[in-house]
């Protein structure tokens, strides 16, 4: 059940990114709706816009994948520190200036 929920969240996230990219590029590249078909300039603009956004998304995901292990280790250390100090809530330990 948890796996299905994760798959649904992934699909939702993908569709949100796709819809936002489509909206952004369409607003940027299609100034009028006077014709049914896109002209060559509009098609080239849409292709370039989508390509840039996809490339940016890939770079962000690569950075996220690179940084994620360090973030996980930090959260584990914060959790262990909070568990070691009885009577102090985990949120207080993590949010304190010395926990940064």
From Swiss-Prot:
CC annotations in GO: mitochondrial intermembrane space protein transporter complex; mitochondrion; TIM22 mitochondrial import inner membrane insertion complex
Q: Which GO terms describe its molecular function?
A: metal ion binding
Tell me which Gene Ontology terms the entry assigns under biological process: protein transport
The protein's UniProt keywords, in alphabetical order, are: Disulfide bond, Membrane, Metal-binding, Mitochondrion, Mitochondrion inner membrane, Protein transport, Translocation, Transport, Zinc
What Pfam families does the database record attribute to this sequence?
zf-Tim10_DDP
InterPro entries membership? Mito_inner_translocase_sub, Tim10-like, Tim10-like_dom_sf
Chief location category: mitochondrion
Quote the subcellular location field of this record: Mitochondrion inner membrane
Q: Which domain of life is it from?
A: Eukaryota
Disulfide links within the chain: 25-49, 29-45
Please report the record's description of how this protein sits within the membrane. Answer: Peripheral membrane protein
Residue ranges annotated as motif Twin CX3C motif: 25-49
Assembly and partners are described as: Component of the TIM22 complex, which core is composed of TIMM22, associated with TIMM10 (TIMM10A and/or TIMM10B), TIMM9, AGK and TIMM29.
Family of this protein: Belongs to the small Tim family.
Q: State the protein's purpose.
A: Component of the TIM22 complex, a complex that mediates the import and insertion of multi-pass transmembrane proteins into the mitochondrial inner membrane. The TIM22 complex forms a twin-pore translocase that uses the membrane potential as the external driving force. In the TIM22 complex, it may act as a docking point for the soluble 70 kDa complex that guides the target proteins in transit through the aqueous mitochondrial intermembrane space.
According to its record, what is known about the domains? The twin CX3C motif contains 4 conserved Cys residues that form 2 disulfide bonds in the mitochondrial intermembrane space. However, during the transit of TIMM10B from cytoplasm into mitochondrion, the Cys residues probably coordinate zinc, thereby preventing folding and allowing its transfer across mitochondrial outer membrane.
Q: What is this protein called?
A: Mitochondrial import inner membrane translocase subunit Tim10 B
The root-end lineage is: Eukaryota, Metazoa, Chordata, Craniata, Vertebrata
